[in-house]
Amino acid sequence: RGSVTLGRMPFAVKPQKVLPLTILGSVATLVILFGFNYDWRQSMINTLVAIVISLSLVVLVGFVGQISLAQMAIAGTAGFFLSKYFSDLPFPLGPIIGAFVAAVFGTLIAVPALRVRGVNLAVITLSAAVAIEQLIFRNKTFAGESGALKVPPPEIGGKDFGPNNTNLKVLGLKAKDDIPPNVWFGVVCLIIVVIMCLMVVNVRRSATGRQFLAVRSNERAAAATGINVASAKVLAF
């Protein structure tokens, strides 16, 4: 597959002390969101968004050993279709449907990539990312003349939790200043990150996670034990 020998893959450590680390990380994030100024809030919210996208690489690259350079484009399709076609749906139904759309695009990319890996797979996924950008994001038929779509803020219980609603108070709490982004938008992002991280941890602990690791270690050996290698790769994408 492009090389004479393959180096040994790094050992996949089984998650431990998940609950204490989750609580510690959440508390530290809340301290930054509520206790620091808007620069820190913006940086933390950007970090939380990046974590959600990076978790897909944890599964795809870390568990299955498949190199993908299309994850940002796939995530972009979710946001694009959410803002254009599902913006009227209540939160969190809209983002969930957007995630399913991203899963469909991930599957479309995975099918031609089933028989390659390594650098060749990276080239294929990079080409797919460029194709998605040109056919969807830069297509005025879909994205409009400006190439940008407005996304309505999430509403929970009739309250605007969007990043610009700095006057929002929940339990009498708000940020230390009135400069966007809204601190409670960051809290929503934190909750989503915690849920997604726990889901990835459970995948690692499950039978599916063990199948992923077997495919990463040796595809032929995994197939010999009855694992459907193609299905495992598509599921990871």
Enumerate the predicted regions with their spans.
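Transmembrane alpha-helices and adjacent helix-loop boundaries
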Residues: R1-F237
